[in-house]
Amino acid sequence: MGDAPSPEEKLHLITRNLQEVLGEEKLKEILKERELKVYWGTATTGKPHVAYFVPMSKIADFLKAGCEVTILFADLHAYLDNMKAPWELLELRTSYYENVIKAMLESIGVPLEKLKFIKGTDYQLSKEYTLDVYRLSSVVTQHDAKKAGAEVVKQVEHPLLSGLLYPGLQALDEEYLKVDAQFGGVDQRKIFTFAEKYLPALGYSKRVHLMNPMVPGLTGSKMSSSEEESKIDLLDRKEDVKKKLKKAFCEPGNVENNGVLSFIKHVLFPLKSEFVILRDEKWGGNKTYTVYLELEKDFAAEVVHPGDLKNSVEVALNKLLDPIREKFNTPALKKLASAAYPDPSKQKPPAKGPAKNSEPEEVIPSRLDIRVGKILSVEKHPDADSLYVEKIDVGEAEPRTVVSGLVQFVPKEELQDRLVVVLCNLKPQKMRGVDSQGMLLCASVEGVSRQVEPLDPPAGSAPGERVFVQGYEKGQPDEELKPKKKVFEKLQADFKISEECIAQWKQTNFMTKLGFVSCKSLKGGNIS
């Protein structure tokens, strides 16, 4: 059996791959005297996704460093955060979290017997804790409470009082769990500094705070439980993992906001200390990297292709997910998963008839599912001389068939392999016997001779990337636009091409995360 790690080695294990440590000198002093007591808490809201492997890998580091580790399932916090977890589902979601987090830890070889698991409501409803909540509320300003939760608590126009209580409860958890340190994402920083300011006001000591970086989602932004395309669920099927990775932003040579590279850096490398790029012999064969920066350097130099990177991540990720899928393949856990996260489409529909005081539906651009597409093939419609039948990759498992009236305006060879902009949530429509599963959006100018140009997404775009109107990127598109409600038609009335050839809605630009959607030359044109 090897020697116990020295205080310096423990410090290295505890702090490696962290973005920031608050209270490092205090941490060093504790490690000279005894083992560190640390906790990680997770509010039991949306389904945990693969980015949760980041804290799991750090928990493995803490155990290697001899730390006493507590995992808190913060059920009360989940309810306080704008009721992200309804009260009637709170117990079910907490049970789901406990089972899935334990399955994750087992899949990376973490011994569960060395961990302490606790629910927030096991102690947060006690007389002593409740009294401290009141004591804290007497010294905390509304401004500080709101500021502390800004990165974590859901921000709404008229915030509930519960969201202002959230940071205070998280601060008190440090005292009631009797720990030296709290570990969390860097998005928790304002809550951590809030705790450092206010716990001493109650006579409690200031704790050490350890922060890991936030892993970008597959779309390049923060990986989020509420943004479906940005994350891979722990129970996603292999085909879903493949589909989501295929749509992930991973531009050749671009290492900025690259969710695929970031996942390798913060999850796969810490767990395995190496990463293997799988590729055909004709492209150089497999290559093993033991230093992440070497892989990043090769990707930046385009020695490693995005396709090979994604395929290699897919294989490595499925090895982590297989034990979790297997564990949840039992009747009891399948029932738990469906009960904790009921399918909204299967909920009981509201009673027929107009609801009293119902508000009209908002007609806003985020209701449109517009995506970057790549035309894989173009053929003349067999029964219509003016129509093309295109197969377009829009980031799904199979390409979509789209019929468009471009024969008179755009040569076939200009469309082949072209990146285009496709409206994907129109109701499929038969066009001269062929089902069209989308609309290829184009700019047009009427006149003596009508001119039409397909809209162009920014250079470097990938099929499946979302196209949105600036300022409306957060909303979820309708599953399918209902023809009778004419949502697209109402919005289209304000579509226009600017003098700079940028596609706009009410003078606000259409864009992707890489830049603006444009056309070649039709200034002032319409969009259809």
From Swiss-Prot:
Coiled-coil portions: none
Main location: cytoplasm
Cellular component per GO, a single term: nuclear body
N-acetylglycine modification, residue list: G2
Keyword list, A-Z: Acetylation, Aminoacyl-tRNA synthetase, ATP-binding, Cytoplasm, Ligase, Nucleotide-binding, Nucleus, Phosphoprotein, Protein biosynthesis, RNA-binding, tRNA-binding
Residues involved in trans-resveratrol binding: Y39, Q170, D173
Presence of keyword Phosphoprotein: yes
Superkingdom as given in the UniProt entry: Eukaryota
Subunit and interaction comment: Homodimer. Interacts (when binding to resveratrol) with PARP1; interaction stimulates the poly-ADP-ribosyltransferase activity of PARP1.
Entry similarity comment: Belongs to the class-I aminoacyl-tRNA synthetase family.
Protein purpose: Tyrosine--tRNA ligase that catalyzes the attachment of tyrosine to tRNA(Tyr) in a two-step reaction: tyrosine is first activated by ATP to form Tyr-AMP and then transferred to the acceptor end of tRNA(Tyr). Also acts as a positive regulator of poly-ADP-ribosylation in the nucleus, independently of its tyrosine--tRNA ligase activity. Activity is switched upon resveratrol-binding: resveratrol strongly inhibits the tyrosine--tRNA ligase activity and promotes relocalization to the nucleus, where YARS1 specifically stimulates the poly-ADP-ribosyltransferase activity of PARP1.
Domain characteristics, as noted in the entry: The nuclear localization signal, which mediates localization to the nucleus, is also important for interacting with tRNA(Tyr), suggesting that it is sterically blocked when tRNA(Tyr) is bound.
Protein name (record): Tyrosine--tRNA ligase, cytoplasmic
Biological source species: Mus musculus
